[in-house]
Amino acid sequence: VVEPGESFTFTFDDETSNNGVFTRSVNAGACTGTFAAPQVEAGRIISYGLHVRCTGTGFLPLSAKIRLQEEHFGFFYETVDETFKSLTEGGYGFVRGEAICGPTTSGHDYRISGEIFAGSHHGFGISREVHLPCNVN
């Protein structure tokens, strides 16, 4: 079970080959994703994002996927927007998503689902919910 939070971190080993001999470096790298909580901006746009930072070795190529999820009935989450980005800056980058904030009388709770793809490694996290006066269609 993944607990909601402000960020998530995962560590990984790295395998290298030298003259056909494979060696494994334990805890060779780590990646952290820090959520930029959904918020309503000018023009009724919901913006949301994920800051990614990786250290060590074995995390290239690096990319991330974020999903804006709208809560329904207190337990079901519908993905209403999704963004994927290759991060070419090295061990860091930012993925930003945007969705239209449609009118509603009561609003909805939103969260971000984030995934980091670091070489052959993968990490996942979810943000805490925020209530916004929106309905994303």
Please place each PLM-identified region on the residue numbering:
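N-terminal prepro-regions of secreted/extracellular proteins
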Residues: 1-41
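Contiguous beta-strand segments within globular domains
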Residues: 39-53
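A short beta-turn/strand-edge loop motif at beta-sheet boundaries
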Residues: 54-62
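Conserved aromatic beta-strand anchor motif in extracellular beta-sandwich/beta-rich domains
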Residues: 64-72
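Solvent-exposed serine/threonine-rich low-complexity stretches and specific carbohydrate-binding patches
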Residues: 78-92
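Short beta-strand elements
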Residues: 88, 120-137
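Exposed aromatic-hydrophobic patches
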Residues: 90-103
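Internal, hydrophobic beta-strand segments that form the core of beta-sheet-rich folds
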Residues: 102-128
